[in-house]
């Protein structure tokens, strides 16, 4: 998104604050705050990683003010939802009803004077950016939103058309990617239990030693043929699983760096802030997920090597096969115990963000 589009978006946002706001309007405003917060955070993280300029206290103030504004706005929305649910009377100072609205509408209308978060946005736009422009000796990225510009309307029309086309293409790509990931996850999860059963079967068969005894019997030949054909299917499934785990590990490492950098930016602005607990909790969740992902990768790579030997008919000693089968069996026990812990203790991560939520937030 270009600077001009950001200016137009913020201008329209602030100009729309002159009347009463419904729950739908508050939801849109909250999403806008989230978008602005993510754009500002990504810009500072990119500049810091690219060594374009050192992180200043003004940038830390930007991010801290935006985070506080977002939290206050979401708290305000939650309070309004509680009032609406309990059907308690609300004073006219905190609530106004639009006379032109439909009488059948049951939405609660809120006076914009209670939206203190947007006052923080205004102060952030008018104060911190002007200070940053003076300190760097260049125009601010976010200019004064109320200053009129004669060429904005014509340029905004062209930019909006290009932006809509590009957004539609990106949205289509995201939808197709999401559908493929859902299909792939469903395919892998459907065969995951069968893979565990197959690991247990081969491990027990290797202990019994039916591969060496009665090698010419009909049952032995059928079992060998079944193992060889089934290994081809398991090989594809495990390859997809290893690929997903490798991508997840990359995302976790990237997210961990962003969380650390954002924590350093905010702590440099407010060293005694209690916000450090939130970032420490996120880092702990990420590191725990990295360990779990690494163990999953190790087990799946072992299984990939094991099934590859079966498919390619490589000459490997029985000792190596037994070791690979034993590791696969141990990993199947680890997976079952991990799933059991998550099912019996659903509140183990109560109050904390999951690693997937953190990855999506910093994507």
Swiss-Prot record:
Residues 1-193, 251-363 are cytoplasmic. The keyword Transmembrane applies. One of its GO terms (cellular component) is peroxisomal membrane. Disruption phenotype: Induces pexophagy during peroxisome proliferation conditions. Leads to a delay in peroxisome formation and a serious growth defect in carbon sources requiring peroxisome biogenesis, with an extended lag phase and slow doubling time, at least in methanol medium. Results in less numerous, clustered, and bigger oleate-induced peroxisomes and more numerous, clustered, and smaller methanol-induced peroxisomes. It is found in: Peroxisome membrane. GO terms for biological process: peroxisome organization. It is a multi-pass membrane protein. Controls peroxisome morphology and abundance under conditions of peroxisome proliferation such as oleate and methanol media. Has additional function(s), which is not present in its functional homologs such as Saccharomyces cerevisea PEX34 or human PEX16. This is Peroxin-36. The lineage of its organism: Eukaryota, Fungi, Dikarya, Ascomycota, Saccharomycotina.
């Amino acid at each position: 998104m270009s600077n001009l589009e950001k200016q137009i978006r913020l201008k329209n946002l602030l100009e729309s604050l002159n009347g009463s706001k419904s729950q739908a309007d508050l939801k849109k405003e909250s999403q806008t705050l989230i978008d602005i917060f993510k754009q500002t955070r990504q810009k500072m993280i990119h500049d810091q990683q690219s060594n374009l300029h050192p992180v200043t206290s003004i940038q830390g103030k930007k991010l801290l003010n935006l985070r506080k504004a977002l939290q206050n706005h979401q708290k305000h929305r939650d309070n309004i939802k509680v009032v609406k649910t309990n059907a308690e009377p609300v004073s006219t100072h905190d609530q106004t009803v639009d006379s032109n609205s439909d009488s059948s509408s049951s939405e609660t209308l809120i006076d914009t004077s209670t939206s203190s978060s947007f006052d923080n946005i205004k102060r952030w736009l008018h104060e911190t950016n002007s200070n940053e422009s003076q300190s760097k000796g260049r125009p601010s990225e976010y200019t004064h939103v109320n200053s009129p510009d004669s060429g904005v309307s014509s340029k905004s029309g062209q930019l909006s058309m290009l932006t809509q086309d590009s957004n539609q293409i990106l949205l289509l790509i995201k939808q197709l990617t999401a559908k493929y990931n859902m299909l792939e996850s469903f395919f892998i999860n459907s065969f995951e239990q069968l893979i565990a059963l197959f690991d247990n079967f081969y491990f027990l068969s290797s202990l019994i030693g039916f591969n060496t005894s009665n090698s010419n019997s009909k049952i032995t030949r059928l079992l060998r043929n079944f193992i060889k054909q089934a290994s081809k299917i398991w090989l594809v499934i495990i390859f997809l699983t290893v690929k997903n785990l490798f991508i997840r590990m990359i995302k976790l490492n990237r997210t961990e760096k962003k969380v650390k950098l954002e924590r350093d930016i905010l702590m440099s602005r407010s060293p005694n802030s209690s916000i450090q607990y939130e970032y420490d909790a996120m880092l702990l969740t990420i590191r725990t997920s990295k360990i779990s992902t690494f163990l999953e990768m190790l087990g799946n790579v072992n299984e990939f090597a094991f099934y590859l030997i079966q498919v390619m008919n490589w000459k490997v000693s029985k000792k190596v096969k037994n070791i690979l089968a034993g590791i696969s069996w141990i990993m199947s026990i680890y997976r079952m115990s991990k799933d059991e812990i998550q099912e019996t203790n659903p509140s183990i991560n109560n109050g904390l963000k999951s690693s997937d939520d953190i990855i999506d937030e910093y994507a």
